[in-house]
Amino acid sequence: MTMSTPTVLLFSYGTLQKKNVQLANFGHELTGREDALPGYALRTAPIADPKVAELIGELHYANAEPSSNPEDAVSGTVFEITESELAAADEYEEAAQYRRISVRLRSGIRAWVYVRA
């Protein structure tokens, strides 16, 4: 009998979609599928840590924030990852002052997503 590793779904609209960020945090590239987070819009915030800015090649973070416009949605990618990869993502995102919440995506599935703390 083979045991499979339990997995969770993680929706990313920002830096966790980048190959170099995935390699640095998970040790491999993730495979995902496109989806969207309805009822949210993207805002940006400056990156304070120069090491993080260098890693991702950007000066600002994307932040998904609830929107009053029902037409708004944030596009991104949903990844199936392990619990240990989720813990690594938590560590990476907490450094950027994000918190993880459970949401329903446009496809109808539930996934974790990081939003501004």
Specify the residue positions occupied by each region the protein language model found:
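Glycine-aromatic micro-motifs
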Residues: 2-117
